[in-house]
Structures are given as structure tokens and as C-alpha cells.
């Protein structure tokens, strides 16, 4: 029998249909992804203050696209996410702090939450890239495990992710989230079509570039985690620490 989201199952299972959410705005998607990420990478400072949330939304690494949003825009996004029960504001601190409610609101396990967060933060990725990039949020046993949770998200009503057509020279399909609605899927489909019209790069060269990119991303993620931990110990944001 399927487990409830709170039981954090290790394997996906069939789940009842959930009410369709309105499409998220780009800033709402970024805020939601950051809250999920920081819950795992800087648990000592989670739930996040507005300042920490702004720092996470605007950080230059592990983000695609890089954004530059104001605190006013973030507060507007938080209000929108609150109306969808995706974000709560804590009441136990004089400084407002915010936490996500993605697992309960969407009725999905934490593994799926991690995958959606990385798709929100970094855009379309292959299952292999997602396994690497979610390492600090959840350790998937293998790529097949990642694909199983992605397949479940894709089969939900409404679907939460979609598998994109394979790009020229690529060995794997990329996945993208559908939390921003069908419009986001259309943009990704057009991008894929443009790639298909171009000259295909040699498979070996493309695979080498992907390998190097993944290795670099892993190093950057480790460094980012170290910076965030040190900044948290000093009681400042990561940007202030680096500045």
C-alpha cells in the first residue's frame, strides 16, 4: 500500500489526484526552491529570514537563471505561495521567518520535493544531473531511483514534471517541472526544437563536457555549502560573508 508523505517512503507509489495549482510565477518558483534547498543545507538557520531568503534567491551559483529580485518582490511571492498553502510564516520569532509546506500541499514524499526544488532552481536536467545536484537534499541510491520518482511525478493528475525530447548528441532526456504551467513546458519544447535544428555535436565531445560540468558543479556545491555554514556561524548572509 502507498505510504503517506509524512512516512517519507523510499520508493514511489500511486497517490490520489491533487487539486491543480495555478501556475507559479518565476519569483514564486525561486522562493519555493530556495526554502527547500536551505532546509537541508543550512538547517541551523531554517526557517529563513527575509534577508537569508533574498540571498538564496539572488545567489550566483547553482541557479539557472541567475535572478536579481528585491525584498518587495520576494514578499509578494511569499503572499502568493501562502495563498496556495505552499509557504508558512513562523510565529515563534520577532524576525519573520518562512518555511515551505511543499510535501503536504502537493502530497508527495521528500524525495520528490528535492527533485522539484532542483528543477525550480536550475531548470531542465537529466536524471543523472538531478542525482548529483540533489546530493545534499537527498541521497538517491542510483539513477533508476531518481527516474522512478520522476515517472511518478509525471503520472500524477495534474502532472508535476515532463520528460523533454532528447537533445542532439545527448544520451539522456532532460526533465522539467510543470509548476509554472504549460507555458513553461512550451518554452522548453521550443528550446529543444531549436537545438534539434542545429548541427549535432559529436557525442563523445558532448559527453566529456557534461562530465566536466557535473564535476565542477559538485565542487561548487561543496564550496557553497561551506560558505553558507561559515556565514551561519557568524550570523550573516553568505553574500555578506563573501563581500
UniProtKB/Swiss-Prot annotation:
* Span list, region Disordered: 1-23
Cite the record's Polar residues compositional bias ranges. Answer: 1-10
Name listed for the protein in its UniProt record? UPF0502 protein RALTA_B0914
> From what superkingdom does this record's organism come?
Bacteria
Annotated signal sequence is none
Query: Cross-referenced InterPro entries, in alphabetical order?
Result: DUF480, WH-like_DNA-bd_sf, WH_DNA-bd_sf
Protein family (similarity comment): Belongs to the UPF0502 family.
Q: Which organism does this record belong to? A: Cupriavidus taiwanensis (strain DSM 17343 / BCRC 17206 / CCUG 44338 / CIP 107171 / LMG 19424 / R1) (Ralstonia taiwanensis (strain LMG 19424))
Amino acid at each position: 500500500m502507498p505510504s503517506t508523505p509524512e512516512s517519507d517512503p523510499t520508493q514511489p507509489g500511486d497517490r490520489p489526484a491533487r487539486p491543480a495549482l495555478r501556475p507559479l510565477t518565476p519569483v514564486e518558483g525561486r522562493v519555493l526552491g530556495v526554502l527547500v534547498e536551505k532546509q537541508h543545507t543550512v538547517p541551523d538557520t531554517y526557517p529563513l529570514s527575509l534577508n537569508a531568503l533574498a540571498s538564496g534567491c539572488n545567489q550566483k551559483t547553482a541557479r539557472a537563471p541567475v535572478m536579481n529580485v528585491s525584498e518587495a518582490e520576494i514578499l509578494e511571492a511569499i503572499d502568493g505561495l501562502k495563498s496556495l498553502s505552499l509557504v508558512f510564516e513562523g510565529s515563534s520569532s520577532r524576525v519573520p521567518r518562512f518555511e515551505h509546506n511543499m510535501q503536504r500541499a502537493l502530497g508527495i514524499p521528500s524525495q520528490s520535493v528535492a527533485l522539484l526544488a532542483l528543477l525550480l532552481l536550475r531548470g531542465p536536467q537529466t536524471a543523472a544531473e538531478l542525482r548529483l545536484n540533489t546530493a545534499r537534499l537527498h541521497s538517491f541510491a542510483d539513477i533508476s531511483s531518481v527516474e522512478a520518482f520522476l515517472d511518478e511525478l509525471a503520472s500524477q493528475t495534474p502532472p508535476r514534471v515532463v520528460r523533454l525530447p532528447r537533445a542532439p548528441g545527448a544520451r539522456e532526456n532532460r526533465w522539467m517541472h510543470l509548476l509554472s504551467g504549460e507555458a513553461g513546458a512550451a518554452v522548453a519544447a521550443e528550446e529543444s526544437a531549436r537545438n534539434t535544428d542545429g548541427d549535432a555535436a559529436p557525442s563523445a565531445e558532448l559527453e566529456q563536457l557534461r562530465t566536466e560540468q557535473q564535476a565542477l558543479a559538485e565542487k561548487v556545491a561543496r564550496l557553497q555549502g561551506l560558505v553558507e555554514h561559515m556565514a551561519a556561524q557568524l550570523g550573516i548572509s553568505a553574500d555578506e560573508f563573501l563581500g
